[in-house]
Each structure stands twice: as structure tokens, then as C-alpha cells.
């Protein structure tokens, strides 16, 4: 997540990798406030199961804001069962137009095992090119590393873990304590 978008806020890396019939979303565990590590074992990747429809989501940004958005996404998925794209667009529209939601500082990567999207507060619902998406302070490092490995024989999980390890080595706001969730269609 760009520091200029959320001044004074740093920290976290989330990656989504779609390969071999599955999607893996992985996130580091570091929570930073300024130059201080507050926690190293946070879980920023979650499973959602509204109405028995399974989705994995990873978030970067304010935890409280992200949980608010995840709750809204669950409600949208309950209203549009099995339609992650539609639920994501509806969430992004609300996020963009609702005065309360506009103030939320977070980004999401979501997947149902078939589709994967990055959802932003600017109203974007982006389906990543090259089957890799990454957000957060180390997102560009993880994205570049994962894209370099996509043609290898590594599984989606191996690509995600290796890319996160590289990001953690480069980005001071990212650690190697990973939460990894897999989902397949």
C-alpha cells in the first residue's frame, strides 16, 4: 500500500498466487507503528464462509477498517451467493460512495479459488494480470519475485512462500511469520 495514500502508516505484505488450479493467499505477521514493531504474529489472511460459499481474503491497512470491510464483503456474498465479482464490485461501490466507508484505510485481496481480485478504497476491483496480486509495503517486492517464479514447476504455495521470504528480506515492515490459506474451485 502506498505510504502517500496513508501517511505515517507502514507495514504488511499480502500476496495472492493463482496456479495449478488453486489460489494461495499469504500474509506476513508484522504490525508496525512508525518505526516500532508492535506485534509479529498477526493474522492478516482469513477464511470467509458466508452461506457455505468459501472465500479467502488478505488485508493490508488498518485492522479495524479491514474487519469492517470483510464483514461488508460477507454480507454482499450472502446477498449474491457464489458471485465474488459482483459482491466485490458492490463492496467497492459502497466503499467509494459511503461517507463513513470512505475514511477506511485498507486494501483487500480476495479469492474463491477461481477468481482473484484486489479491492481498493478508490473503487477499484482489479483482476490481476499474470495470476499474481500483491499489496502492502512489501507488495512490489513480493509481486516481482512471484512473477519471476510463475513459469517454474513450483506450486502456488511454494511461489507465495518464496516471494514472501524475498519481500521480508527487503522490506523492513514485513516479517517472515506467514499465514497461508489455500482455496481451489
From Swiss-Prot:
It catalyses: ATP-dependent cleavage of peptide bonds with broad specificity. Its main location: cytoplasm. One of its GO terms (molecular function) is threonine-type endopeptidase activity. It is found in: Cytoplasm. It holds the Pfam family Proteasome. The active site is at 12. Na(+) binds at residues 168, 171, 174. PANTHER family: ATP-DEPENDENT PROTEASE SUBUNIT HSLV (PTHR32194:SF7), METALLOPROTEASE TLDD (PTHR32194). NCBIfam families: ATP_dep_HslV, PRK05456.1. Belongs to the peptidase T1B family. HslV subfamily. This is ATP-dependent protease subunit HslV. It comes from Ruegeria pomeroyi (strain ATCC 700808 / DSM 15171 / DSS-3).
Amino acid at each position: 500500500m502506498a505510504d502517500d495514500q496513508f501517511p505515517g502508516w507502514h507495514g504488511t505484505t499480502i500476496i495472492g498466487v493463482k496456479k495449478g488450479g488453486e489460489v494461495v493467499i499469504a500474509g506476513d505477521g508484522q504490525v508496525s507503528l512508525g518505526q516500532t514493531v508492535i506485534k509479529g504474529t498477526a493474522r492478516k489472511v482469513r477464511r470467509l464462509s458466508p452461506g457455505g460459499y468459501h472465500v479467502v481474503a488478505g488485508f493490508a491497512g488498518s485492522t479495524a477498517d479491514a474487519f469492517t470491510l470483510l464483514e461488508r464483503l460477507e454480507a454482499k456474498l450472502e446477498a449474491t451467493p457464489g458471485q465474488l465479482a459482483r459482491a466485490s464490485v458492490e463492496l467497492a461501490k459502497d466503499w467509494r460512495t459511503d461517507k463513513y466507508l470512505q475514511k477506511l484505510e485498507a486494501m483487500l485481496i480476495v479469492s474463491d479459488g477461481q477468481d482473484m481480485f484486489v479491492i481498493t478504497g478508490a473503487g477499484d476491483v482489479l483482476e490481476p494480470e499474470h495470476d499474481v496480486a500483491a499489496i502492502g509495503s512489501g507488495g512490489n517486492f513480493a509481486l516481482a519475485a512471484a512473477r519471476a517464479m510463475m513459469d517454474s514447476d513450483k506450486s502456488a504455495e511454494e511461489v507465495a512462500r518464496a516471494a514472501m521470504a524475498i519481500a521480508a528480506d527487503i522490506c523492513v515492515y514485513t516479517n517472515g511469520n506467514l499465514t497461508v490459506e489455500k482455496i481451489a474451485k
